[in-house]
A protein has these predicted regions:
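C-terminal motif of bacterial Sec signal peptides marking the signal peptidase cleavage site
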Residues: 15-16
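Substrate-binding cleft of secreted/luminal carbohydrate-active enzymes
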Residues: 293-313, 320-321, 327-381
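Polysaccharide-binding and catalytic clefts of secreted carbohydrate-active enzymes
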Residues: 49, 80, 87-90, 97, ...
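Catalytic domains of carbohydrate-active enzymes, especially glycoside hydrolases
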Residues: 82-108, 206-211, 295-298, 369-376
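Acidic-and-aromatic substrate-binding clefts and catalytic sites of carbohydrate-active enzymes
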Residues: 69, 77-79, 104-109, 122-123, ...
Length: 381
């Protein structure tokens, strides 16, 4: 680990922005990061078909849909395959063992779906997710299909969809609601749970996924008019508690569907790093989700804060997440390498320039995570 940490520090100091060129350290020992190979081989003797690959020590990297416009749109299958092979090989060489690949970012699909329309960057006649899976598994990387449960298309994109799609129909009956030019599903409706179950079943049935992963897009607004009619009809007294219960019901439905399809496939959640922000702004009850069995297998709080952040200093915030994560849930620390070389205007005066002044900040955060009770880290570049 020390050899790779030193390489990481050197590379950060050579790059002004610290973007995709960063190098991540390998876990300290092979044993910590070895997926359960013996179990996998034993299961393979008993069962036919794919055996999901997951790692005890997770070192993850997100590959968001925004990049698809660059290396998917207008590309042949061969060109796309070469691009993802290069990216995943770089991740592998950086010590990454788990990829979160965006397949359902905005009410759409970057896989062959009978439920959702194609993503806007997918214009080829090949299946991009099949290609991504093949290339990742060839490198012995674990692949978690990354979904955004509630975020849908922009107003313009939705207007262009055929009326046959469920998400389009829901714009007419209030299950989907518009906020700042984009549509979002309202989790107070149990029909949303059913749609997400279908999505998960479609993915696990048709693709050799190792996990399903969601991030921090829960309620898009704290404004009371978003779901005023539904709240009034519910008879609940506390809007915040009611919204949190809606999100928890949805999360548990997704977890249950994953395990129903294949108990060996993992389900993970990556909420924002601020515990209070989760609880009061997005109505994500992360204390509950990380604190008891049945909501997720692992949780990846986005700890995109410097050590000098005045609101959520990294070390103290990591410790808070450690204290509330139970033994049945693995804590993985999300690290914001995309901030390197940039001012952080939300960090307060003490931390605003930390990502500029401290090019070794990610390396130091990794070292702290490795000394903590967390089961790994994940990088957002």
């Amino acid at each position: 680990m020390k050899r790779f940490a030193a390489a990481l520090l050197a590379l950060f100091m050579l790059t002004s922005c610290g973007t995709a060129e960063s190098s991540l350290p390998e876990p300290e020992t092979v044993a910590e990061a070895t997926y359960f190979q013996q179990d996998r081989e034993q299961l393979g003797e008993l069962e036919s078909g794919y055996i999901p690959v997951n790692f005890e020590h997770m070192t993850g990297e997100w590959f968001p849909y925004m990049g698809y416009e660059e290396y998917m749109h207008g590309r042949s299958e061969e060109e796309f395959r070469a691009s993802v092979r290069e990216r995943y090989s770089e991740a592998k060489s950086d010590g990454v063992n788990t990829l979160y690949l965006h397949v359902h970012p905005c009410g759409d699909a970057y896989y062959r779906s009978e439920i959702f329309p194609r993503g806007v960057s997918w214009d080829g006649d090949y299946d991009p997710f099949a290609v991504m899976l093949e290339e990742a598994h060839e490198l012995e990387l674990s692949v978690h299909a990354w979904l955004n449960p509630l975020r849908c298309q922009t107003t313009e994109q939705m207007d262009g969809l055929p009326d046959s799609f469920t998400v389009k129909k829901w714009t007419e009956n209030g299950i989907a609601k518009q906020v700042n030019g984009r549509w979002y599903l309202d989790p107070s409706h149990t029909e949303v749970d059913d749609l997400l179950r279908q999505c998960i079943r479609e993915l696990i049935t048709n693709y050799n996924v190792d996990g399903v992963h969601i991030d921090d897009y829960f309620y898009p607004t704290a404004e009371t008019d978003f779901d005023a009619a539904e709240f009034a009809e519910s008879g609940s007294a506390d809007l915040g508690e009611w919204r949190r219960s809606n999100c928890t019901r949805m999360v548990k439905a997704m977890y249950s569907e994953v395990k129903s399809c294949d108990s060996r496939v993992e389900f993970g959640i990556s909420p924002q790093g601020s515990i209070n922000g989760n609880y009061n702004s997005q109505f994500a009850d992360v204390r509950l989700w990380s604190g008891e069995k049945g909501c997720c297998d692992y949780i990846v709080p986005q700890l995109y804060f410097g050590f000098r952040n005045e609101t959520c200093p990294f070390a103290e915030t990591l410790a808070l997440w450690e204290s509330m994560t139970c033994p049945d849930v693995r804590l993985v620390a999300g690290l914001g390498a995309y901030k390197l070389g940039k001012a952080d205007k939300w960090a307060g005066a003490a931390g605003e320039n930390e990502w500029i002044e401290s090019p070794d900040i990610i390396q130091r955060q990794i070292e702290l995570v490795e000394r903590s009770s967390a089961a790994g880290y994940a990088i957002y570049k």
